[in-house]
């Protein structure tokens, strides 16, 4: 049995294949996922698993250099936005690097998901609960 934090074989596999600056998306249940992009569907029912649960597991295993978030989250989901920023701050301390946070429009965000290695869909049902993680290096 794998000893690491990620037991899901699809998520573990995609993280292990990430190269520097490759991207991985963690999204809510409603984000449209391009047909050309690998979909890893974790959603069981509304809210299960939550966006933050999925993000926490992914970032325990993935070295993150930058994060892209839809600008609209600030207005339409401020509580999750604050939780997300706190998580990224803690991740910076744990990794020992600065994580650049970039904001974009939701429309541009959706277009960028097509270039990611995979999209991991959570059961989150709150607005703009999506993030694009850019892979860093551990050396």
From Swiss-Prot:
Gene Ontology biological process terms, A to Z: D-ribose catabolic process
Reactions performed catalytically: beta-D-ribopyranose = beta-D-ribofuranose
Pfam families: RbsD_FucU
Subcellular location: Cytoplasm
GO MF annotation: an example: intramolecular lyase activity
Record key words, sorted: Carbohydrate metabolism, Cytoplasm, Isomerase
Gene3D superfamilies the record matches: RbsD-like domain
InterPro entries documented for this protein: D-ribose_pyranase, RbsD-like_sf, RbsD_FucU
Pathway as given in its UniProt record: Carbohydrate metabolism; D-ribose degradation; D-ribose 5-phosphate from beta-D-ribopyranose: step 1/2
First-level EC class: isomerase
Active site: 20 (proton donor)
GO cellular component: a single term: cytosol
Enzyme Commission designation: 5.4.99.62
Binding site for substrate: 28, 106, 128-130
Similarity comment text for this entry: Belongs to the RbsD / FucU family. RbsD subfamily.
Quaternary structure annotation from Swiss-Prot or TrEMBL: Homodecamer.
Function: Catalyzes the interconversion of beta-pyran and beta-furan forms of D-ribose.
Protein name: D-ribose pyranase
Record gene name: rbsD
